[in-house]
């Protein structure tokens, strides 16, 4: 599993005192309130700078962050297009049968008869339930509802998901 999680993307500065505006990459932006520090980098690596978080504010669909040592707009400007990254051990604990999207991407998806349907490439949030986007070997997309009645098994050790597809969800050409 991935050690680091991107929880936000810095898209702009906010004001003149070094605050940045970030798009949350989490389903619950209030999680930022509990963060004491974060890495800030364009990509995940072993040399990401670590910043203490001085303050967190919420404005519309954004999170306004103030990092220690970033005290003016010029310093904040240099953080644009960077990600706010946390260590997995500092992530919120998920309820049973829920997963981080980054852990599902790339997973091989099979039906209950062990026929490979494809590889999970994306997760769509629809409001009522998520939908898994699975790309088949012949490049067709299969949209699979992320429901307990459909997803029968998720095995990270084998990088495998088993689904019981509702009748008529896919044609036989997949």
Curated annotation (Swiss-Prot):
It is found in: Cytoplasm. Keywords: Chaperone, Cytoplasm, Ribosome biogenesis, rRNA processing. GO terms for cellular component: cytoplasm; ribosome. Signal peptide: none annotated. InterPro entries: PRC_barrel-like_sf, PRC_RimM, RimM, RimM_N, RimM_N_sf, Transl_B-barrel_sf. It holds the Pfam family RimM. Residues 96-169 form the PRC barrel domain. One of its GO terms (molecular function) is ribosome binding. Binds ribosomal protein uS19. The PRC barrel domain binds ribosomal protein uS19. This is Ribosome maturation factor RimM. It comes from Acetivibrio thermocellus (strain ATCC 27405 / DSM 1237 / JCM 9322 / NBRC 103400 / NCIMB 10682 / NRRL B-4536 / VPI 7372) (Clostridium thermocellum). The gene is rimM.
